[in-house]
Regions:
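Alpha4 helix (beta4-alpha4-beta5 surface) of REC/receiver domains from two-component response regulators
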Residues: 64-68, 89-106
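Two-component/phosphorelay signaling modules centered on CheY-like receiver
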Residues: 14-32
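Short hydrophobic/Thr-rich beta-strand motif most characteristic of the beta2 strand and flanking loop
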Residues: 28-37, 43
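The short loop immediately C-terminal to the conserved phospho-acceptor aspartate in CheY-like receiver
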Residues: 13, 57-60
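C-terminal output helix
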Residues: 92, 110-119
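Active-site beta3 strand of CheY-like receiver
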Residues: 48-58
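Short amphipathic alpha-helix used as the core "switch/output" element in two-component signaling
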Residues: 42, 64-79
Length: 130
């Protein structure tokens, strides 16, 4: 990555959260990992992100809490790119995610090469209009 990209990762599975965080940090990103909805809401209120990776289903929350986080994130930071990820994907969830402003939708397990390609092809922070 030419410029450091600020990425929010939200997942309720610690292994996935740590794995994605590790891979993206090694690729040069500044990563904010959040284990669930409450941590994510706090991070969204405090910081602007270039990209967010949001799991749709978060334990301890409504069944599609990640979509609610997507809405909150886009309200606070409309230029943030969002990749929605889920192991429980349906066409309805995909349509809903895209309607709420997701840039991409990925089924789990995540193909890391595909994910890194998406991240590397994002417009850099300096090339985006404010």
């Amino acid at each position: 990555m030419a410029e450091e990209v600020h990425i929010l990762i939200v997942d309720d599975e610690p292994t996935i959260l740590l794995g994605l965080s590790h891979v993206l940090r090694r690729a040069g990103a500044d990563v904010t990992p959040c284990l669930g909805r409450d941590e994510a809401e706090e991070a969204i209120r405090k910081q602007v992100f270039d990209l967010a990776l949001l799991d749709v289903r978060l334990s301890g929350s409504e069944s599609h809490a990640g979509l609610d986080l997507l809405t909150l994130l886009k309200q606070r930071s409309p230029h943030t790119h969002v990749i929605v990820m889920t192991a429980y994907g349906t066409d309805e969830i995909r349509r809903e995610a895209m309607a709420r402003g997701a840039s991409h939708y990925c089924d789990k397990p995540i193909n890391l090469d595909h994910l890194l390609g998406l991240v590397k092809n994002l417009p850099t922070p300096s090339s985006r209009s404010s």
